[in-house]
Curated annotation (Swiss-Prot):
HAMAP family in alphabetical order: Lipoyl_synth (MF_00206)
Main location: cytoplasm
Record-listed [4Fe-4S] cluster 1 binding positions: 37, 42, 48, 276
Protein's name in the database: Lipoyl synthase
Top-rank taxon, per record: Bacteria
Family indicated by similarity: Belongs to the radical SAM superfamily. Lipoyl synthase family.
Annotated EC: 2.8.1.8
Catalysis performed (reactions): [[Fe-S] cluster scaffold protein carrying a second [4Fe-4S](2+) cluster] + N(6)-octanoyl-L-lysyl-[protein] + 2 oxidized [2Fe-2S]-[ferredoxin] + 2 S-adenosyl-L-methionine + 4 H(+) = [[Fe-S] cluster scaffold protein] + N(6)-[(R)-dihydrolipoyl]-L-lysyl-[protein] + 4 Fe(3+) + 2 hydrogen sulfide + 2 5'-deoxyadenosine + 2 L-methionine + 2 reduced [2Fe-2S]-[ferredoxin]
């Protein structure tokens, strides 16, 4: 039996040490912003921050959910910061970002789940950096009536919501969420604003069967999702769900081939794929693929 405590060579990444990495880190700290890169212990942080790519996490640093895969703190959430949208817009301007990714903790305590705060952040960035494209990675807004409409009206360039895993693992891995609610949210955003690119992702290596992954791929395409990401689950701490398997690069290539036959505009499937990894480059490819589809 393989030693799952030792990561295979294809998972290993270099420790961050570039000047650009530390400059990005200092700016984020000075503007009192949270990032999912740090909170979720992302393995790609060194590469991304060295390129001044970061995923800002709004609505505080404490989540109202306790998903078994996630390293973000859970508990009593922070008070909503009304000045966060302006500070975020300032960071985007100072980093001269062409593409920004905004995510958040779950805020089940808020009436709209934080949807209006996302909208304010989008609005502030549009004011100071009108040429910057905006991608948002949101919670599921479970039982938050009107949240999808708020998001759709804010017109992000990309709307991302991750289904995270296969339905059979929701009770143990993502107990506060509902798989079909996530599918419905993705479908509703596309129906409300067809021009918004939709995106979703999942982790593998949690104990799912390959046929379950293929079914999720089918479900996401049925929900009109444009861009699919699939990456390897990595255990953040010993208190989180254990890795059941390290999926090989060859297996990821197989999943990518399967997904590409379903009609997605883009598919990214490899061990280090994360929702916002190479998001700026992928957005350009997404637009190009859409234009090619129109003329084909």
């Amino acid at each position: 039996m393989a030693n799952l405590n030792k990561r295979p060579d294809w998972i290993k990444v270099k420790a961050p040490n570039s000047t650009e990495y530390y400059n990005t880190k200092d700016l984020i700290k000075n503007l009192r912003l949270n990032t999912v890169c740090e909170e979720a212990a992302c393995p790609n942080i060194g590469e991304c921050w060295s390129k001044k790519h970061t995923t800002v996490m709004i609505l505080g640093s404490v989540c109202t959910r306790a998903c078994r895969f996630c390293n973000v703190k859970t508990g009593r959430p922070d008070l909503l910061d009304p000045y966060e949208p302006q500070r975020l817009a300032e960071a985007v301007q100072k980093l001269n970002l062409k593409h920004v990714v905004i995510t958040s903790v779950d805020r089940d305590d808020l009436e709209d789940g934080g949807a209006s705060h996302f909208a304010e952040c989008i609005s502030e960035i549009r004011k100071s950096s009108p040429n910057t494209t905006i991608e948002i990675l949101t919670p599921d807004f479970l039982r938050k009536e009107g949240a999808a409409e708020i998001i759709a009206n804010a017109k992000p360039d990309v709307f991302n919501h991750n289904v995270e895993t296969v339905p059979s693992l929701y009770k143990t891995i993502r107990p506060g969420a509902r798989y079909y609610n996530s599918l419905s949210l993705l479908h509703n955003i596309k129906k409300l604003s067809p021009e918004i690119f939709t995106k979703s992702g999942m982790m593998v290596g949690l104990g799912e069967e390959i046929n379950e992954v293929v079914q999720v791929i089918d479900d996401l395409r049925e929900a009109k999702v444009d861009f699919l990401t699939i990456g390897q689950y990595l255990q953040p701490t010993k208190n989180h769900a254990e890795v059941a398997k390290y999926v090989t690069p060859e297996e990821f290539k197989y999943l990518e081939r399967v997904a590409k036959t379903k009609g997605f505009l883009m598919v990214s499937a490899n061990p280090l794929t994360r929702s916002s990894y190479h998001a700026d480059e992928d957005f350009q490819k997404l637009k190009e693929n859409y234009q090619q589809k129109l003329v084909s």
